[in-house]
Amino acid sequence: MRMDKLTSRFQNALADAQSLAVGRDHTIIEPVHVFSALLDQQGGSTRPLLMQAGVNVPLLRERLTEILEALPKVSGQTVNVSPSNELSRLFHRTDKLAQQHGDQFMASEWFVLAVVDDSGGLGQALRAAGAEKKKIEAAIDKLRGGETVQTENAEEQRQALEKYTIDLTARAESGKLDPVIGRDEEIRRTIQVLQRRTKNNPVLIGEPGVGKTAIVEGLAQRIVNGEVPEGLRSKRLLSLDLGALIAGAKFRGEFEERLKGVLNDLAKNEGRVILFIDELHTMVGAGKADGAMDAGNMLKPALARGELHCIGATTLDEYRKYIEKDAALERRFQKVFVGEPTVEDTIAILRGLKEKYALHHGVEITDPAIVAAATLSNRYITDRQLPDKAIDLMDEAASRIRMEIDSKPEELDRLERRLIQLKIQREMLKKEKDEASKQRLADLERDIEVLDREFSDLEEVWRSEKAALQGATKIKESIEQAKLDLEAAQRRQDYAKMSEIQYGVLPALEKQLVAASQAEQHDFTLVQEKVTAEEIAEVVSRWTGIPVSKMLEGERDKLLRMEADLGRRVVGQEEAIKVVSDAVRRSRTGLSDPNRPSGSFLFLGPTGVGKTELCKALAEFLFDSQDAMVRIDMSEFMEKHSVARLIGAPPGYVGYEEGGYLTELVRRRPYSLILLDEVEKAHSDVFNILLQVLDDGRLTDGQGRTVDFRNTVIVMTSNLGSHQIQELSGDDSPEVYTQMKAAVMEVVQAHFRPEFINRLDDIVVFHPLDKAQIKQIARIQLQGLEKRLAESELKLDLDDRALELLGNVGFDPVYGARPLKRAIQSQLENPLAQQILAEAFVSGDTVQVGVDGGKLVFAKV
C-alpha cells in the first residue's frame, strides 16, 4: 500500500494511530487505532458521517476503548510498531472501494465502509452501535455530493460552508440576533435587488455604525418568519467568515482551495443560499501573493454566472478605495445606500433593543434614558454615527448601574473599613494591663457592637434588595425564552405547543413578574436599578469632557456668582466679566445656539489690562485648571503658508498624518476655552478659516474630518486701538468710554473684514487701569508670593504704606499692570531673597515689610 495514495487527512489519522499505539505500549497498529484516530480527528468527516448514518457515537467510543484496553502490551524496551495483517487487509479493501468510485486518492469514508462490512471485532462493535451498510453509503453520497477525490486535500474542501460561514437564518431561528427596528426601505430595496434576474447582488454602502450588518440580520429574521417574497422564502443566509478562511492557510494555494470549496458548495446548492460578505473590501487583495489570484478575482466568474448570490457591506471610503478601482467587480454589484437614521428613528430603534439590553444587564432602562441617549449622542458625539453611538451610550450606562449593584455600596464599605480599624485597635489594647487601657477596651467593645449591628442591618437590606432584583431578572429571562419558543412553534405550526405557551406559560410568568415588581415598588435605599437620563448624561460627560449632566446645587450657585469669582482675580473689567459670564451661563443651561460656539469674543485694549488674565481665570473657573485653556499665539501665523499648521497639512505635504494644531487640540478636548492671542498679528487667511468656526461651530481639517467647536468658548485678544485708548484715558466717565470705544471700533473695522466682525458675539473694549486698581492687583499678586514663602514656612506681612509704595512704583498708564510685576520683583523679592540667604529669616518667622526713606524695609516678628 502506497502512503502517497492516501488523502492528507487519512495520512494524519494514520500518524495519530501510530502515536496512540506507542502511547499504549502496543507493538502492532490495529484497525481500532486508526478508527479511534479518525473519530477524534479535529475537523475530520468520520464523526459527522457516523452521526448522519444514525450511529450512537458515545456508545461506539466506549466499545473502542474496551477493545484498546484488551490489546496485549509490551513494556520495558523500545520496539518498532508495524501495521497488523488485519489493517493491511482493510486498507486493500479501502483501495478497491476508492477505485470502484473513480477516486485517485483513498479517503477516510471508504475505510469506515470497509470496517462496517468486516467480520472482525471492530466491525462488530460498529454494527452494535447502530451502523448499517446502506445508511453509511447514503451518508457518504450526501457528504461527497457526487464528487470524486482527485486531490490530496479533497477531504479538507468538504463541508466548506459549515466551516467557513455562519448561518444567520439559524441564529435568527434560535433568537440570537437583536431585533431590527425600522430600516424597512433599505431591506425592501435589498430584497428588490436580490429578486433581479441578473446582477442580483446588492452591496450595502454607508458610514460605520449606521446599521449595514443589522439590515442583513433583519433580512435573515424576515426569511425565518416568512415575511419575504416567494423567491426568497426557503433560502439560507450565510455570513462568510473571512478570518476562518485565511487562518491556518500556510502554503500557497491553500487559501484559494478553501475559497474554491466554498464556491463549489454554493454552486451545488443551486441558488438556495445567499452569501453575506461583511467588509466586502477585504476580499480585494485577500490571499494575493506573487502571481497568485486574489479572492476578489475568484468571485467574479461565480458572480457573472449567477452561481454566487451575494450581499456585500462596506463603508463609503473603502468602497471608493477598493471596489470602484476594480470596475469589473463593481459592475457585478448593485449599490444600496444606507443613510444615518434621524434622532426619532434612533429612539424607535433603541426602544426595540431596550428589552435585550435590560435583560443582559439585569437593570431597568427608562424611556427618558432612551430619548437622552439619542439626543445627547447626536449633539455631543459628532465623530460617530447614529444609531451605533446611541446604543453604546445606553449599553455603557446600563453596565455602570449593573457594576454599582454588584459592588458594595459606599455606606456599607465605609462601615466595614471603620469596623476593621476598631477591631485592630481592640487586639492592641488586649495586650495592655493598666486600668485606663481596660476602660478604653470596654468603650471600644461597645462601639464595635453598635457598628457591627448597624453593619449587619445594612448588609441584610443590601442583600435582600439585590435578591429582589435578581428574582425579577430571572423571570424576565424565562419570559424571553417563552416568547422564542412561541415563535418557533408558530413556524412549525405546532398549535398545541403555541396554545400551551400563549395561554399557560406566558400568563403565569407575567403574573410572577407583576408580583416581583410590586415587591420592588418600595424605594431601594442602597441599590439603584434604573437607568435614567442622568446616567446617560454622565456617560456622555466621561466620553467627551463636556458637562452635560444635571447641574448640582453647588454648581448653580457657582454660576450665579461667577462675576464675583472672576472679579477677585481680574480687576476693573466688570463689562468684560459680565459678557463672558453670560455666555457660560447660556451654554450650561442649554439656551445657546446649538450650531455655534458657546461664545466668541474679541477683547481689545492696551497691554497689561487683563485680557489674557481674564481667559486664564475663566479656564480655571470652568475646568479647575489653567491647562484646559488652548492658547495659540497668533504672531506665529504671520506667513500665508503657516495657516496649514492650524488645520493640518494637505495631502502630499510633509506632516499630513499629524493633523492640525488647533483641530487636534479641540478633537481631544471638545469642551475648552480657545485663546487666540494677539490676533491682529496673524495673516489675513487665518480669518477665512475662523469664519467657518464662528458661524457654524465646525471646521474641516486637512484629512477631511469635521471637528466640532460648538462646545468651545473662543476668545481673541488684540492691541488694536490701544493708542486711542491711551489718549482718552484718565477720565472714567461713561461718555468718555463711549467715545473711546467708537474710536477703537473705527480702527478694528479698518483692520478686520466686516464678515469677520459680524460673526462675533461681542467686542469688548477693556478699561485702562487707575492707581486704586493697581493697588488691588498688587494685593492679588502678593498672594502668589505668600504661597511660595509658605512652602519655606515663612509668613509675609505688608503694611498699607508698603502696598502704597509698590502701587506707586508699579503704576504706568501706558503699560497697565505689567510694570507692577517688575516693581514687586525689584523692590520686594530681590532684597528679601538676599535676607533669606543671609539667614536673617528662618523657618517659622514672619517677615514684616514696612517703608523707611522711600524704600521697603524688612523686620522679623
Curated annotation (Swiss-Prot):
InterPro entries: AAA+_ATPase, ATPase_AAA_core, Chaperonin_ClpB, Clp_ATPase_C, Clp_N_dom_sf, Clp_R_dom, ClpA/B, ClpA/B_CS1. Belongs to the ClpA/ClpB family. The keyword Membrane does not apply. The Clp repeat (R) domain probably functions as a substrate-discriminating domain, recruiting aggregated proteins to the ClpB hexamer and/or stabilizing bound proteins. The NBD2 domain is responsible for oligomerization, whereas the NBD1 domain stabilizes the hexamer probably in an ATP-dependent manner. The movement of the coiled-coil domain is essential for ClpB ability to rescue proteins from an aggregated state, probably by pulling apart large aggregated proteins, which are bound between the coiled-coils motifs of adjacent ClpB subunits in the functional hexamer. This is Chaperone protein ClpB. It comes from the Bacteria. Residues 769-861 are annotated as: C-terminal. One of its GO terms (cellular component) is cytoplasm.
